[in-house]
């Protein structure tokens, strides 16, 4: 829609007015303000997982080895029978361009029949690659066994590979791919948007302070008694009875901006990869850390035992092992950090690797020096 613009205002004056208006709008919200829609969701408005079993055809000799995957042949025979093609019993089909796959998708909330959704296709046999394949019509079922969608289309595989003369080169993964918009929704999931003119907001992260601030913001905008906190995660909100008014109410409510409470201090440690992530609330009390590495090196080298001249002995080969223990000098470091940057800087100063940080952080938590919740995933 085009709005008429008066030509009596010069361009610089109009631009200055727009900048001033934008500045007032920018400073009307706190710097860390977030919308309610980014902090909470409406109960019942959620996706549903779908799954299906199907066949991918058109592969360039990279499909399942049907001798080792009998379910692929069984699925193919069943499909051909449904199409009116009968394969003689006992026929040994050695196909290399067919692969059995699992198809998964997420049914979006409030999805309607006819809507297209993305699907992920993953090989479940011994196919070497799904690149260039086409997924045949596959029903997608929910947890209740009902069909909610049908998938079919050409696969988009991000990987690439080549092999010749015993050499093989592969980039990324070849046994899984996606079909953007490859499934059509056939059935909608019934959603009851609240009961008795009441809906429930569920915070993404439990926090009593944030729940109280959301309640205060909603009651300030729509009147006292509109919202009430049930606990640190759930908030009950009264909505208009008519559906069109309810949609307008929810649209305005979820756009309200509030200042969420500061997240609790937390340190996340991935024990498999050695990754350590800390938020800004993580602090460290004054403590001493002794950091040193103990290295054990065992080396084995062959030794030739040569018999003496004019003797009846034989030359033999023996093994001689050397064991050496090295211990780097530990450094007693005083650490006291008030923020995330200082904590990381202090730990890096003693030469700690990510794997060393796992042990250091656990010891600091046990000693009471780490003022944060330590979570190992």
From Swiss-Prot:
UniProt entry keywords in alphabetical sequence: Bacterial flagellum, Periplasm, Signal
GO molecular function, one term: structural molecule activity
Signal peptide: 1-33
Subcellular location(s) of the protein: Periplasm; Bacterial flagellum basal body
A Gene Ontology cellular-component term: outer membrane-bounded periplasmic space
Biological process annotations from GO: bacterial-type flagellum-dependent cell motility
InterPro entries given in the database record: Flag_FlgI (IPR001782)
HAMAP family: FlgI (MF_00416)
PANTHER family: FLAGELLAR P-RING PERIPLASMIC PROTEIN FLGI (PTHR30381), FLAGELLAR P-RING PROTEIN (PTHR30381:SF0)
Function of the protein: Assembles around the rod to form the L-ring and probably protects the motor/basal body from shearing forces during rotation.
Similarity remark: Belongs to the FlgI family.
Subunit structure and binding partners: The basal body constitutes a major portion of the flagellar organelle and consists of four rings (L,P,S, and M) mounted on a central rod.
Name of the molecule in the record: Flagellar P-ring protein
Species, as recorded: Nitrosospira multiformis (strain ATCC 25196 / NCIMB 11849 / C 71)
Phylogenetic placement of the source organism: Bacteria, Pseudomonadati, Pseudomonadota, Betaproteobacteria, Nitrosomonadales
């Amino acid at each position: 829609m085009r709005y008429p613009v008066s030509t009596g205002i010069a361009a610089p004056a109009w631009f200055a007015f727009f900048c001033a208006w934008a500045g007032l709008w920018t400073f009307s919200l706190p710097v860390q303000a977030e919308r309610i829609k980014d902090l909470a969701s409406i109960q019942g408005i959620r996706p549903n997982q779908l799954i299906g079993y199907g066949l991918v055809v058109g592969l360039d000799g990279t499909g399942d080895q049907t001798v080792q995957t009998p379910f692929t042949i069984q699925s193919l025979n069943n499909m051909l029978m449904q199409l009116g093609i009968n394969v003689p019993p006992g026929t040994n089909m050695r196909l290399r361009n067919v692969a059995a796959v699992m198809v998964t998708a997420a049914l979006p909330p409030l999805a309607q029949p006819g809507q297209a959704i993305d699907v992920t296709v993953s090989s479940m046999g011994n196919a070497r690659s799904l690149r260039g394949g086409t997924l045949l019509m596959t029903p997608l079922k929910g947890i209740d066994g009902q069909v909610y969608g049908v998938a079919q289309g050409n696969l988009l595989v991000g990987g690439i590979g080549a092999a010749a003369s015993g050499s093989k080169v592969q980039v990324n993964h070849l046994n899984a791919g996606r079909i953007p918009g490859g499934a059509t929704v056939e059935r909608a999931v019934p959603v009851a948007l609240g009961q008795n003119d009441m809906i429930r907001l569920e915070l993404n992260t439990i926090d009593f302070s944030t729940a109280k601030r959301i309640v205060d913001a909603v009651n300030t905008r729509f009147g006292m008694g509109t919202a009430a906190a049930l606990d640190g995660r759930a908030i009950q909100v009264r909505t208009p009875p008519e559906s069109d008014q309810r949609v307008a109410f929810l649209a305005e409510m979820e756009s309200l901006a509030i200042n969420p409470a500061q997240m609790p201090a937390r340190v996340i440690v991935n024990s498999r990869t050695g990754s350590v992530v800390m938020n800004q609330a993580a602090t460290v009390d004054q403590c001493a850390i002794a950091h040193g590495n103990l290295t054990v090196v065992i080396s084995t080298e062959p030794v030739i035992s040569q018999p003496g001249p004019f003797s009846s002995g034989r030359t033999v080969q023996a093994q001689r092992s050397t064991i050496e223990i090295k211990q780097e000098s530990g450094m007693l470091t005083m650490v006291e950090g008030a923020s995330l940057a200082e904590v990381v800087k202090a730990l890096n100063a003693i030469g700690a690797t990510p794997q060393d940080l796992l042990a250091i952080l656990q010891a600091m938590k046990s000693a009471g020096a780490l003022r944060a919740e330590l979570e190992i995933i």
